[in-house]
Amino acid sequence: MSYFEHIPAIRYEGPQSDNPLAYRHYDRTKRVLGKTLEEHLRIAVCYWHTFVWPGQDVFGQGALRRPWQQPGEPLERARQKADAAFAFFTKLGTPFYTFHDTDVAPEGANLHEYVENFARMVDYLGEHQQASGVRLLWGTANLFSHPRFAAGAATSPNPDAFAWAATQVCHALDATHRLGGENYVLWGGREGYETLLNTDLAREREQLARFLAMVVEHKHRIGFTGALLIEPKPQEPTKHQYDYDVATVHGLLTQYGLQNEIRVNIEANHATLAGHSFHHEIANAFALGVFGSVDANRGDPQNGWDTDQFPNSVEELTLAFYEILRHGGFTTGGMNFDAKVRRQSVDPEDLFHGHIGAIDVLALALERAAVLVENDRLDALRRRRYAQWDSEFGRKILAGGYSLQSLAADALARGVNPQHASGAQERLENIVNQAIYALR
């Protein structure tokens, strides 16, 4: 019997439905700005929180009792987990999924066993993909859970740990390519430090850059045409991570000439941990030319750690989608639910409730963001604010037509007297609220 056999396929039933196992707002075929909601959102379910996490926290052991998490032959349990995962994807009706290598295959006792186990499970995932039509949004390697990576992977003081990590990424990237994945993600969970007293910052940055360059080289060697993405996070599990936020990642990539090879996968909860809004990180990624994909979740404002809850704020996501839509939407990226049910949510239905609610929130937010894009009121006020830079004088400054000295002389000769214009923040906020809360 399938773990989810008693749960029906999730269908769109409209806003008036009181069926908890139905979409009220996500009509995947509805067209918005020339695309269907499914094409815009490109929703993915993550393997790790949904099928791997046993429900433990720092104060208690696992509270979940999934069948594939019980003792048994490791590869058989991995296949059982894959069966449940694809049953879930198809019942939910989501087009994509994501995984770490060790989510889908047992690691084994050594590197040879890792390679063999992973290869077998990649074959099995490929069969499920072909049968279901579910696609891989991105793959990645877990370079943070095992004690060998306690001091980092690429930034480890032990080159053997670096080599082990390189082996995992080599095979995970190969697997992503083989499974038709559209991106490959690098998250440096332990690429950072716990104390500066034993850390050589310059050396560790050089090691990290070398590792990234090797990944880029391998991508081109195997002909992988998807995007390479770094996922920024400021801390946790380390005190400070080298991929702190979007700007920090861009600075690292630029320093080592990798800015045209790697983009970013932005997680909402990581943005808030870095002291930024989700909106800020997405807007900054577009401004720096490195936007790639999104991990959709939320944190708890009263907690200082990564709670990975399902997103539930239409307001927050409307602004995020506004930035994405006004820049043309996703290309290879999508909305991956890097979110988990709470430790007390032990029923199979809880997995569906979490995803259904979050998917409806995404649909609502995208439609409201589309209103902001279509009416152009925000962009019109933004263009008006900078209009003077489009004058002959403004363009001459930006084109290098003045030196500092000649511009100072010109300002003195003209007796410039700049006048401050309103930033109109209150009006702009009202425009956003009108789009979000307008009766339909």
Swiss-Prot record:
Q: Which GO terms describe its cellular component?
A: cytoplasm
Keywords in UniProt for this one?
Carbohydrate metabolism, Cytoplasm, Isomerase, Magnesium, Metal-binding, Xylose metabolism
Class of the enzyme per the UniProt entry, highest EC level: isomerase
Enzyme Commission number: 5.3.1.5
Which PROSITE patterns does this UniProt record tie to the protein?
XYLOSE_ISOMERASE
Q: Where does Mg(2+) 1 bind?
A: E231, E267, D295, D338
The question of whether Magnesium is a record keyword is answered with: yes
Cofactor info, note text: Binds 2 magnesium ions per subunit.
Reactions this protein catalyses? alpha-D-xylose = alpha-D-xylulofuranose
- Which InterPro entries does the annotation name? Xyl_isomerase-like_sf, Xylose_isom_bac, Xylose_isomerase
Give a yes or no for keyword Hydrolase in this entry.
no
Give the residues the record marks as binding Mg(2+) 2.
E267, H270, D306, D308
**NCBIfam families attached to this UniProt entry:** PRK05474.1 (NF003998), xylose_isom_A (TIGR02630)
Record family assignment: Belongs to the xylose isomerase family.
Q: How does it assemble?
A: Homotetramer.
What's the protein here called?
Xylose isomerase
Q: Which organism is it from?
A: Burkholderia thailandensis (strain ATCC 700388 / DSM 13276 / CCUG 48851 / CIP 106301 / E264)
Encoding gene per record: xylA
